[in-house]
Amino acid sequence: MLKRQTEGSVICPACGVLVGVNDETCYNCGRRNPGLWGYAAALRRLGNDLGFVPLVMGGTITLYALSLLLSRGSIHGMLSPDSRVLLALGASGAFPVFEMGRWWTVLTAGWLHGSFLHVLFNVMLIRQLAPAVADLYGAGRMAIIYTIAGVTGFALSSAAGLYFPNIPIIPGAVFSVGASANIFGLLGALFHYGRRTGNSHAREAGLQYAIFLGLFGLIPGTGVDNWAHAGGFAGGLAASMLLDPLTRERTDHMIGALICLSLTVVALVASFVTALPYLIQ
């Protein structure tokens, strides 16, 4: 429970020193509102990611289960939901974005998955990478990077699906789901952190993961959306450059993260509501 604290001391989320819960600024680092309106201690108990990782993992698994439930008798091999159900819930790609005008699916597609192995693999990567990025950038900036990477990844994928649908090996996606664009954004953030700070471990980890997963996507028959991967990495890299990891996380980063999550929820609701006539048939 997020119980509000009205008196006493809390740990500044930016620099870690003890400050008053009602202090306007941290005396040590200058961060404004270090008590986060009395919720700093409660949020700290959620971990460095402030509960974002469990939220993404839980939401992703829940939506996968919902897609299987709505598929009813149309579940395919490897526990793959019906593509029409995924389309209704917010799949992205050239067809949903340009033919159907469902532009908001660049926010929602990263929460949907096409098979049990697909969701399992991506959830495991999120569990491994997102806390690491949160440790380096802070929870707010990590959530912003994750969201922006999904948007840029699926935007590029959809555009490539419209203009380059038949390129050998790396065709654009007419239809696409999965958190891999967001995951590549986290890799881009790790790479930038390593380059910005001189941390060779972070730089090499981000780059090597991206290269390995990128090469895997070039294997014929895997159905991997390489354009989403490239767009996600570029988006995560660009966002992390703007959200300089050498600066302390600020309150406006947390506000930005809440806006990103709110827009994603609105997009998911919009997808579901606009698809409701189909789903109740």
Q: What residue ranges belong to the model's regions?
A:
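A broadly conserved sequence feature marking short terminus-proximal activation segments
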Residues: M1-Q5
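A detector for small-residue-rich transmembrane helices and their helix-helix packing motifs
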Residues: G8-V21, Y27-Q281
